[in-house]
């Protein structure tokens, strides 16, 4: 309380602006690239009545911010003191170099939205196993990606079926390891009484001839077969008188 002085007094009111809340909502475009957006975060602050607020434009990896900041003129109605920012999702390039291999369609490629789950191609190539030149990301990062298949030729067990023949000279009759796309290398020569060795073949009958220079095209363990040609003998008969 104050005591009235013995003279006229003039009092002046002093007003302080009230503080009212405002909200800034940050929305991000959905990963499917549709026109739907999901709220990433909301920021709640207060400011004086009639203040003009220009909320911060945040930066989010993989998204493009709106071109201009919005303004909020603070009023007593906090429900109206709202600014909504919508961020579009960026696209990045994703490519797969199969390097001579093949893959069934359905894998992720082309221009891909940020954070999209990546489905890698199931790459196949006869006689080879595949790895990629770098680790495959689970989701699309905020950068372009270019993968390349690295193929490794497979090795298989080769069995030699002698068909009654036996080894002469260099070489052994055994099971050996051969590699797809490379030559069979040294193959033994065989002998068989009454026959001439005609080489190794891919089938017991028919098939194709397999030499040391033949490239392996089989895609698994396999057998080659020795083939022989009967020797024809000329028999002359003589009578008792030598005629």
Task: Give the predicted meaning of each segment.
Residues 1-243:
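Secondary-structure capping and domain/repeat boundary segments
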